[in-house]
Amino acid sequence: MSTVQFNEMIALPNSEISQAIIQTEKELFQLQFKKATRQPFKPHEIKKAKRRLAQLKTILTSRLDALEKKRGNTVMKLIKKQNYMTGNF
């Protein structure tokens, strides 16, 4: 697997980020399984997989938070508008 920079990950759409999260979790599981069964593996790959997983989840979470905040602001505006129109402040 080639190393993808964080700036390149940000440009990915949400669907690709979700797929990358699943793929990275599988990779991390396989590496941990190799470690537990004392099969040959490269220990630094576990660190890279954990870091990549954290970065991908951070990007996805920040996007979802921004979307939720945007929706929340819209809902609050509608509620305030409705309260203003009905006289319920």
Swiss-Prot record:
Domain of life: Eukaryota
GO molecular function, one term: structural constituent of ribosome
Subcellular location: Plastid, Chloroplast
A GO biological process held by the record: translation
Record Gene3D superfamilies: 1.10.287.310
Entries under Pfam families matching the protein: Ribosomal_L29
Any one of the GO CC terms: chloroplast
Keyword annotations: Chloroplast, Plastid, Ribonucleoprotein, Ribosomal protein
InterPro entries the record matches: Ribosomal_protein_uL29, Ribosomal_uL29, Ribosomal_uL29_CS, Ribosomal_uL29_sf
Family statement drawn from the similarity comment of this UniProt entry: Belongs to the universal ribosomal protein uL29 family.
Protein's name according to its UniProt entry: Large ribosomal subunit protein uL29c
Species annotation: Trieres chinensis
